[in-house]
Curated annotation (Swiss-Prot):
Component of the small ribosomal subunit (SSU). Mature yeast ribosomes consist of a small (40S) and a large (60S) subunit. The 40S small subunit contains 1 molecule of ribosomal RNA (18S rRNA) and at least 33 different proteins. The large 60S subunit contains 3 rRNA molecules (25S, 5.8S and 5S rRNA) and at least 46 different proteins. Its main location: cytoplasm. This is Small ribosomal subunit protein uS15. InterPro entries: Ribosomal_uS15 (IPR000589), Ribosomal_uS15_arc_euk (IPR023029), Ribosomal_uS15_N (IPR012606), uS15_NS1_RNA-bd_sf (IPR009068). GO terms for biological process: cytoplasmic translation.
């Protein structure tokens, strides 16, 4: 899939292993993995940060192969899922930081243009999440209240 606001084709990506069972060297059981996920979530980590931490520090290659569920589904089942989807949250955070930069540097035309691109991505993603039901139908992105969403 190509990039939205640039010329890149986006060919490179990591490939999941063909075998969908946990590898023989992985000794973790499903209950301990779920416990660790909930512990990290209570510390304030995002789902992708939880996955990276489990992979790098605890030797758990794929949570889904061990537990049978993705990290977000585990968090939703335990009531710890974030209110905003993670990709939308990260875009809003980026838009807030660019807007803050523009307050200090009013003549930065390139950042002004990039802010327009970021906000158009936010609107597109919000439209998708409203359609799917991950966001309420009345949810709307407003730049004035965006810093409160991220804080």
């Amino acid at each position: 899939m190509g990039r939205m606001h640039s010329k890149g084709k986006g060919i490179a990506s990591s490939a999941l292993p063909y075998v969908r069972s946990p590898p023989a060297w992985c000794k973790a059981d499903a209950d301990s993995v779920v416990e660790q996920i909930l512990k990290f979530s209570k510390k304030g980590m995002s789902p992708s940060q939880i996955g990276v931490t489990l992979r790098d520090s605890h030797g758990i290659p794929q949570v889904r192969f061990i537990t049978g569920q993705k990290i977000m589904r585990i968090l939703k089942a335990n009531g710890l899922a974030p209110e905003l989807p993670e990709d939308l949250y990260n875009l809003i955070k980026k838009a807030v930081s660019v807007r803050k930069h523009l307050e200090r540097n009013r003549k930065d035309k390139d950042s002004k243009f990039r802010l327009i691109l970021i906000e158009s991505r936010i609107h597109r993603l919000a439209r998708y999440y409203r359609k799917v039901g991950a966001l309420p139908p009345t949810w709307k992105y407003e730049s004035a209240t965006a810093s409160a969403l991220v804080a």
